[in-house]
């Protein structure tokens, strides 16, 4: 008997906080027959909220994956986070989707987070269905919600389904002329037929509608109540129809992408992979780089929130591997065959704090927990300060910090203490400078001579390195050692922060054979680099955000006048409907206070969209961070610093 090949579709459910995305996932599983009873966010019995903290707070933090099947179509549901600080996780999840359901609460309308998610989906060309949830609440006016979507998201919507007074959903067909006009706008052939009075057949309209939805130029609107299972069967029908097409390649060559890493309660490392082409079998050896392979020893897929072991995976499938080598964004197989899709850059951590266990005996356990958490979330980084021995934690936003701390307490059972977060600064040289330290010239104890120059570069350039010393004069091992020393030296500038936006040139090098070793060059290079920066001086840079602020017109004056109070620079203004859009930039350290102020005086009617712009010169006069010591070079550093002070 011939095996029926499943069509696999990966969809994402995205929404602002409390719009009901986890409840919708439960309802989809229930209506498709995958689960026998509906879980509840309030009671903590949902299938996809796996972390204790998620159940406690009623919001989805990690990306949970489950699936259901209708006839010969399998749908993997990626239930994505809804909190601002977790957009990095959202963006990673978006890259594996064939389509998205964007939830909008009928009561709350389009929220700030809804706009951010819609912008991200459009930027990555992912087809979208709008699902208006909670229509069974009192005081709902659907035409107002439609207008809200048009004003704040897109005019290109088509109402495909609504409800009658008894809350029984029905599907709108193509009998209404306005439905025809919405579908055929932009298609000259169909528009001409319609204009001259020729009949448009349903097949033509459906084909044009599907093509426009796939090209992200039309967005169908559906309605319902996930909590009370209203409109869910119709949503399942449209998901499993021709609306979403699998993003996969016609190739036998294997290609898959790692988009998520997590740890199970018993400490097993789980790696999530989306397959785009080829078939992966148990015990296959797979390339993950030019020099590295992994062997597939265990392979799972998620069904009803549970892991099920499988022997093979087909294109389109999301699989889970137990593997210690795979990292986020690794490609399994042929990297060239990965579908092109614009990847939104993950922002850099902008804040840091210290974190310590209340009981010193739990310090090692805390470090182990941080290792697991940071492995799952690259936006969370940590290190142990070698001066104070404190654990320094860097992160994107305060909600991320709060969730991380609660996770450490609830999952790992470690009571912790933290300090108030501070901004992560960077440094850039003020002018071009050079410095040389010669061999056998005190206080240089190393058998090496190094001459370096540093030149400031425009903001956002990063570190550039060039060697003017030929390999014929100084061999590769010495040259590599100089680069390693410079890389180490760039970790700490004059204020103790990382250096950036400069060109470092290796201009002169000398060694004595046979006494000189690469270690001599490795130790001397950061000392020479520091002296060059002392000659040039450095300036502090801080993270800036670009923003779009939407405020009702009556609050424009207040929002504009408050900008300078929070160090914001408004670059442009636009009028859209009853709102004014303020476009500008602001230091990351000020955005939360400005956002809170906007929310307060507009009574929650403002929207603030932000993206990391990069680092810019700060007006903060000084912000020192203690240097991390190095016993092998610090004595020499201090001697050169003392000499060059005079």
UniProtKB/Swiss-Prot annotation:
Residues annotated as binding GTP: 15-22, 79-83, 133-136
Protein name: Tetracycline resistance protein TetS
TM helices/strands, residue ranges: none
Keywords for this protein: Antibiotic resistance, GTP-binding, Nucleotide-binding, Plasmid, Protein biosynthesis
InterPro entries: EF-G-like_DII, EFG_II, EFG_III/V, EFG_V-like, G_TR_CS, P-loop_NTPase, Ribosomal_Su5_D2-typ_SF, Ribsml_uS5_D2-typ_fold_subgr
Organism per entry: Lactococcus lactis subsp. lactis
Disulphide linkage map: none
Family statement drawn from the similarity comment of this UniProt entry: Belongs to the TRAFAC class translation factor GTPase superfamily. Classic translation factor GTPase family. TetM/TetO subfamily.
Coiled coil: none
Gene name as annotated: tetS
Entries under Pfam families matching the protein: EF-G_D2 (PF22042), EFG_C (PF00679), EFG_III (PF14492), EFG_IV (PF03764), GTP_EFTU (PF00009)
PANTHER family in UniProt: RIBOSOME-RELEASING FACTOR 2, MITOCHONDRIAL, TRANSLATION ELONGATION FACTOR G-RELATED
Stretches assigned to the tr-type G domain: 6-247
One biological process term in Gene Ontology: translation
GO MF entries: GTP binding; GTPase activity
Function field: Abolishes the inhibitory effect of tetracyclin on protein synthesis by a non-covalent modification of the ribosomes.
């Amino acid at each position: 008997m011939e095996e029926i090949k499943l069509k696999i579709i990966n969809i994402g459910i995205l929404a602002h906080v409390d719009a009901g995305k986890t409840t919708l996932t439960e309802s989809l599983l229930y209506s498709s027959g995958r689960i026998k009873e509906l879980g509840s966010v309030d009671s903590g019995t949902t299938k996809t909220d796996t972390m204790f903290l998620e159940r406690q707070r009623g919001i989805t933090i990690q990306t949970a994956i489950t699936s259901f099947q209708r006839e010969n179509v399998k749908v993997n549901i990626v239930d994505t986070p809804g909190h601002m600080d977790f957009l990095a996780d959202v963006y990673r999840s978006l890259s594996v989707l064939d389509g998205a359901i964007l939830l909008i609460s009928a009561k709350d309308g389009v929220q700030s987070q809804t706009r951010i998610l819609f912008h991200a989906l459009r930027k990555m060309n992912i087809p979208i269905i709008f699902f208006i949830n909670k229509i069974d609440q009192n005081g709902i006016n659907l035409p107002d919600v439609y207008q809200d979507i048009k004003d704040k998201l897109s005019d290109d919507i088509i109402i495909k389904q609504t409800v009658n007074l008894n809350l029984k959903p029905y599907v709108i067909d193509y009998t209404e002329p306005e439905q025809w006009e919405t579908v055929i706008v932009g298609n000259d052939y169909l528009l001409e037929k319609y204009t001259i009075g020729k009949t448009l057949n349903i097949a033509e309209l459906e084909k044009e509608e599907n093509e426009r939805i796939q090209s992200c130029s039309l967005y169908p609107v559906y309605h319902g109540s996930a909590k009370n299972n209203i409109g869910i069967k119709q949503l399942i029908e449209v998901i499993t129809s021709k609306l979403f097409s699998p993003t996969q390649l016609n190739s036998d060559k294997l290609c898959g992408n790692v988009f998520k890493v997590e740890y199970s309660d018993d400490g097993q490392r789980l790696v999530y992979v989306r397959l785009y082409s080829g078939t992966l079998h148990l015990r296959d050896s797979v390339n993950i780089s030019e020099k590295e392979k992994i062997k597939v020893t265990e392979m799972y897929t998620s069904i009803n929130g549970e892991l099920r072991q499988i022997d093979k995976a087909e294109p389109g499938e999301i699989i889970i591997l137990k593997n210690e080598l795979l990292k986020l964004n690794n490609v399994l197989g042929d990297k060239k065959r990965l579908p092109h899709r614009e990847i939104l850059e993950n922002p850099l951590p902008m804040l840091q704090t210290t974190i310590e266990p209340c009981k010193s005996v739990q310090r090692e356990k805390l470090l182990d927990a941080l290792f697991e958490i940071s492995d799952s979330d690259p936006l969370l980084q940590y290190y142990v300060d070698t001066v104070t021995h404190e654990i320094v934690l860097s992160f994107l936003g305060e909600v991320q910090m709060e969730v991380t701390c609660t996770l450490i307490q609830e999952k790992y059972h470690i009571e912790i203490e933290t300090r108030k977060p501070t901004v992560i600064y960077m440094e850039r040289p003020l002018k071009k400078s050079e410095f040389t330290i010669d061999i056998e010239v005190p206080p240089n104890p190393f058998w090496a001579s190094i001459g370096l120059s540093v030149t400031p570069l425009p903001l956002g350039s990063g570190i550039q390195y060039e060697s003017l010393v030929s390999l014929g004069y100084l061999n590769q091992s010495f040259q590599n050692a100089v680069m390693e020393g410079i890389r180490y030296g760039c970790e700490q500038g004059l204020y103790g922060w990382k250096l950036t936006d400069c060109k470092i040139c290796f201009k002169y090098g000398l060694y004595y054979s046979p006494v000189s070793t690469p270690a001599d060059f490795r130790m001397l290079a950061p000392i020479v680099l520091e002296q060059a920066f002392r000659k040039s001086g450095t300036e502090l840079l801080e993270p800036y955000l670009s923003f779009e602020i939407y405020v009702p017109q009556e609050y424009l004056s207040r929002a504009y006048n408050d900008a300078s109070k929070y160090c914001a620079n408004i670059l442009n203004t636009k009028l859209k409907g009853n709102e004014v859009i303020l476009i500008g930039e602001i230091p990351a350290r000020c955005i939360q206070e400005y956002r809170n102020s906007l929310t307060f005086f507009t009574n929650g009617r403002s929207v603030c969209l932000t993206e990391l712009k990069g680092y810019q010169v700060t007006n903060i006069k000084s912000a020192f961070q203690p240097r991390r010591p190095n016993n092998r070079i610090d004595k020499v550093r201090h001697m050169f610093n003392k000499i060059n002070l005079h």
